[in-house]
Amino acid sequence: MKIGLFIGALATKMNLHDQIKMIIDAEKRGFDSFWFAQTGETDVLTTIALAGKETENIELATGVIPTYTRHPHVLAQQAATVNAAISNRLILGIGPSHRPGVERLGLKYDRPALYIREYVEILRELTTQGHTNYQGDIFNIESSFNLIDSTPMPIMISALAPMMLKVAGEVADGTITWMAGLTALRRHVIPKLNAASASAQRGQLRVVAGVPFSVTDDIRNTKIVAGEKFQVYGRLENYRRILDYGEVEGPSDVAMLGNEVQLAEQIAQYFDAGVTDLILAPFASDIQDESNLSNLDTLQGIAAEYNV
């Protein structure tokens, strides 16, 4: 049971230097991991490589890198290089992203579950052996590179739908979710992931749950703020589906809100449900205020009970 921080769900409005300072601060505060979503800002693997030189123990993770714009050979080589640079602390989270964004780039969003299955299998061979001769339905690849100082890294996928959870259970090291609340995790995500893992005769996998988080004594108004800040996720097909699985109206219903005692109780419920890693995206309770200092102070105290 681990607690980490997650940025990228909202525009960070931070330059590269400030992002690295935030990661250094996260390690000093005792957070177990720091997760980046690849958005329209800095390249996350480059940021991780830079942050890794300033930190020692914190896991640094991508949550997630869209794959349709990256050939698996290119991503495998880059990830192995970054992993070596940060003393093998990288968690490589990948996902197909969303149809509208992929098609805006002139690419086909085709058979995403099969595509990700083959992509993970290729990544696994390249990052563990340094070579592959892969013949699949989508990819036909013969490639190699020298693995220098890099050990095999966990490969996670952003699995929310049933077919993707099957892929995650059979070939990946687990799933990374966003906007999956307790009900969706208990009834849908974790049972399907575990069933797929068991059928493939694999052990327990990581369930990484990303959740918006805010310390507040005014839950009603903070929920309104959450609804405004995260409203886009209620419109994207993949997230809308997981919200429906959780029987909630919108993203604000998933946000973790309250004082320290209330938040500690909510966090415990996620771990009781079978989540292995809880990655929290702090947001300010005031729509005009981007300060997350009180969030981090409170979360640091709660995380100390788990990250030992």
For each predicted feature, which ranges?
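Active-site-adjacent structural elements that line small-molecule/cofactor binding pockets in enzymes
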Residues: 1-308
